[in-house]
Amino acid sequence: MAVIYWDRSKIVWSFEPWSLRLTWYGVFFTVGIFLACLSARYLALSYYGLKDHLSFSKSQLRVALENFFIYSILFIVPGARLAYVIFYGWSFYLQHPEEIIQIWHGGLSSHGGVLGFLLWAAIFSWIYKKKISKLTFLFLTDLCGSVFGIAAFFIRLGNFWNQEIVGTPTSLPWGVVFSDPMQGVQGVPVHPVQLYEGISYLVVSGILYFLSYKRYLHLGKGYVTSIACISVAFIRFFAEYVKSHQGKVLAEDCLLTIGQILSIPLFLFGVALLIICSLKARRHRSHI
């Protein structure tokens, strides 16, 4: 049986006297966020009908978007960390509270990151509602919903490189044997579930970006956000079935993992938003 053996170093650079380390996960995380922000800014400036808006200049819009992306990290990362602490390691962090801020030891939840982003989008749109009224909550979330897959792909690629969030054992020819996995069994071929997820997110996001970029379909406000939320929840829910769950279940007899439980509210939010947007679009068409 042909398998892939993964034995790459997790460290790019280290300075032992000060215990400083640059990990490949950190590199992929940074590159993914940076490329996603660049793509979103380009899309907003060129293809979302803003460049001809008379109430503000293109440079003002560029600065506003850059501020939005830069400061979003202050909500995404803490949100991801807090959700991980609460849902994935509460008993441990209750005994070792000093570890909560030691984010370099690992431990981020994508669901918490999404919640942190949505909170920041709401705050930012409120701050800018008089300066640039076009930057509404749904505009910002639609914009990022078109490019989220870029960041998600690189983050999952970082997980793969870091040998974490590994899959369950498999006999498929593309099974991966990790030399030093953070979970699961060493020396056993497993599903490269990190790549399953990352590629799926990238495909969904690519389709949404293409539709927004080419404007082949007239997607109204909120549609990209709702489709992105539904897709992410769907992908994450089923990816959990081939993940090594590290005991992250609500109880021994529970059929769902915490990752699946947390995906349900995201799915419901996406469905509710899709229904609301569809009803508004229908009412709008009836008045034309």
Curated annotation (Swiss-Prot):
Residues reported to bind a 1,2-diacyl-sn-glycero-3-phospho-(1'-sn-glycerol): R156
HAMAP family registered for this protein in UniProt = Lgt (MF_01147)
GO CC field: plasma membrane
Q: Where in the cell is it found?
A: Cell inner membrane
TM regions (residue ranges): 18-38, 68-88, 107-127, 135-155, 193-213, 222-242, 256-276
Look up the domain of life of the source: Bacteria
Q: Determine if Transferase is one of this entry's keywords.
A: yes
Identification of the protein by name: Phosphatidylglycerol--prolipoprotein diacylglyceryl transferase
Q: Which GO terms describe its biological process?
A: lipoprotein biosynthetic process
Among PANTHER family, the record links this protein to: PHOSPHATIDYLGLYCEROL--PROLIPOPROTEIN DIACYLGLYCERYL TRANSFERASE, PROLIPOPROTEIN DIACYLGLYCERYL TRANSFERASE
Q: What does this protein do?
A: Catalyzes the transfer of the diacylglyceryl group from phosphatidylglycerol to the sulfhydryl group of the N-terminal cysteine of a prolipoprotein, the first step in the formation of mature lipoproteins.
Pathway field? Protein modification; lipoprotein biosynthesis (diacylglyceryl transfer)
The record's keywords, sorted A to Z, are:
Cell inner membrane, Cell membrane, Membrane, Transferase, Transmembrane, Transmembrane helix
Q: How does it sit in the membrane?
A: Multi-pass membrane protein
> What Enzyme Commission number does this protein have?
2.5.1.145
Q: Which family does it belong to?
A: Belongs to the Lgt family.
Q: What Pfam families does the annotation carry?
A: LGT
In its UniProt record, a GO molecular function of this protein is: phosphatidylglycerol-prolipoprotein diacylglyceryl transferase activity
